[in-house]
Curated annotation (Swiss-Prot):
<dbReference type="GO" id="GO:0016126">
    <property type="term" value="P:sterol biosynthetic process"/>
</dbReference>
<dbReference type="InterPro" id="IPR002202">
    <property type="entry name" value="HMG_CoA_Rdtase"/>
</dbReference>
<dbReference type="InterPro" id="IPR009023">
    <property type="entry name" value="HMG_CoA_Rdtase_NAD(P)-bd_sf"/>
</dbReference>
<dbReference type="InterPro" id="IPR023076">
    <property type="entry name" value="HMG_CoA_Rdtase_CS"/>
</dbReference>
<feature type="glycosylation site" description="N-linked (GlcNAc...) asparagine">
    <location>
        <position position="19"/>
    </location>
</feature>
<dbReference type="InterPro" id="IPR023074">
    <property type="entry name" value="HMG_CoA_Rdtase_cat_sf"/>
</dbReference>
<dbReference type="GO" id="GO:0008299">
    <property type="term" value="P:isoprenoid biosynthetic process"/>
</dbReference>
<comment type="similarity">
    <text>Belongs to the HMG-CoA reductase family.</text>
</comment>
<feature type="compositionally biased region" description="Polar residues">
    <location>
        <begin position="12"/>
        <end position="28"/>
    </location>
</feature>
<feature type="glycosylation site" description="N-linked (GlcNAc...) asparagine">
    <location>
        <position position="16"/>
    </location>
</feature>
<protein>
    <recommendedName>
        <fullName>3-hydroxy-3-methylglutaryl-coenzyme A reductase 1</fullName>
        <ecNumber>1.1.1.34</ecNumber>
    </recommendedName>
</protein>
<keyword id="KW-0472">Membrane</keyword>
<feature type="modified residue" description="Phosphoserine">
    <location>
        <position position="577"/>
    </location>
</feature>
<keyword id="KW-1133">Transmembrane helix</keyword>
<feature type="region of interest" description="Disordered">
    <location>
        <begin position="1"/>
        <end position="45"/>
    </location>
</feature>
<keyword id="KW-0256">Endoplasmic reticulum</keyword>
<feature type="active site" description="Charge relay system">
    <location>
        <position position="265"/>
    </location>
</feature>
Amino acid sequence: MDLRRRPPKPPVTNNNNSNGSFRSYQPRTSDDDHRRRATTIAPPPKASDALPLPLYLTNAVFFTLFFSVAYYLLHRWRDKIRYNTPLHVVTITELGAIIALIASFIYLLGFFGIDFVQSFISRASGDAWDLADTIDDDDHRLVTCSPPTPIVSVAKLPNPEPIVTESLPEEDEEIVKSVIDGVIPSYSLESRLGDCKRAASIRREALQRVTGRSIEGLPLDGFDYESILGQCCEMPVGYIQIPVGIAGPLLLDGYEYSVPMATTEGCLVASTNRGCKAMFISGGATSTVLKDGMTRAPVVRFASARRASELKFFLENPENFDTLAVVFNRSSRFARLQSVKCTIAGKNAYVRFCCSTGDAMGMNMVSKGVQNVLEYLTDDFPDMDVIGISGNFCSDKKPAAVNWIEGRGKSVVCEAVIRGEIVNKVLKTSVAALVELNMLKNLAGSAVAGSLGGFNAHASNIVSAVFIATGQDPAQNVESSQCITMMEAINDGKDIHISVTMPSIEVGTVGGGTQLASQSACLNLLGVKGASTESPGMNARRLATIVAGAVLAGELSLMSAIAAGQLVRSHMKYNRSSRDISGATTTTTTTT
């Protein structure tokens, strides 16, 4: 039996249950068994039943007729050619043979289709399905001498909530129906209507009707959909609300910053704020940008490894760098090629270009420059086959040793000295406990785990929160959170020196999500909104140092909480849902 074509069973009801909340399964009685066994179901008709003779005899007759008539006609054809008799002159016998050949051919052609399609054209009746159910029940019934199986009550799932939809104008209703029917592609609504808000509303309504699921809790109003058209998000149906908290003031390089953090994790902002307080009282933190360069690494292939090596020698030759830089820098007035590094894997070459990108994060900028260089290289290397503009030697949105060692984006180190009395009063721990915990957890523990750039407590928490608040690419949190946290007792063990080194902070203050109203406001709060008018790239570098400073504060506070044994207590107080989940679950499973 083909289970794919089997209709669903009707729902089981229990007349003994007045409220309908439960249904019971009980073994059938013996009288039911006798009645079921006495039931007979007529087999469904088949297409082959219409033949006057049994199928095997009919097949034998037509197979014999087809080949014998074909042999006879071929024999007559040869005789006519031999005696120069026109082929169109036929006798009655030959005419009958031709008709028999055509008839047998038609039958044989139809025969091979009958057996193939008759299982599809003959559908089993509802009684047949009942018979199959009867057989299945008999097969699964176990004959035992033990007492009957107790009744098992199965709770019904609650009915889904009805979809709450807004009433739309008649014209919009027609468009919604066209989207559902596939007449109008959903992605083309903005260009067809010329109104991004209206397009999102129509797409949202079509989505609810197609899926049968309500998205009433996803807000639609209060967002500028024009600002994301063609650059931030396609086919929008609403926007997500994430709370933004402020940690600070963060005293960094002599300036005070109020750091916006978009997060749904309790304790995160409070903990970072405590770290900022300890650093502020101790005189603040200082930061240094070690390197500023975005990378892109295409992969190219040659016929031999020797030829790929020739490209490597050409690109890494200092005499050729100026020419490559001129070609590369055409992509933007802010793009400045810094270095070219090439590595070989067989006959494949991976070329890592690094360039400064001003206040932009710079992925598009460096990709354009790489494209210019690849087109230029085809003159000297016509046999070069460009496989991809990115060969993962960049490496973007993936944990990679090349970023940990060489850096990508902004490489920043941030440090602070926290006085011993501040450690005791504000952080509720001791210098010795912090130093020991950092060595065993962040250094030795991460090494035991085989961590790549994860020699820290929770750098990604702070990086992600600041990234979302300021319009950065959240996916680049992967490499941007690579961090090593160092702690050392100084001044005869009275104070502690803490630092974070982050080689791959990928941020920008122009382009992408930084132009959105909420994210732009957070950048303005930090004083790094838009491009720097003083020096290209200054705002982006300052944002990177703020990220590192916030990470430093977060590391200091969390490590202190762990050393003092406060982590579990604080999270149980501030990072738990206040809802009675067990009660809600019980209500859901016991009510209709």
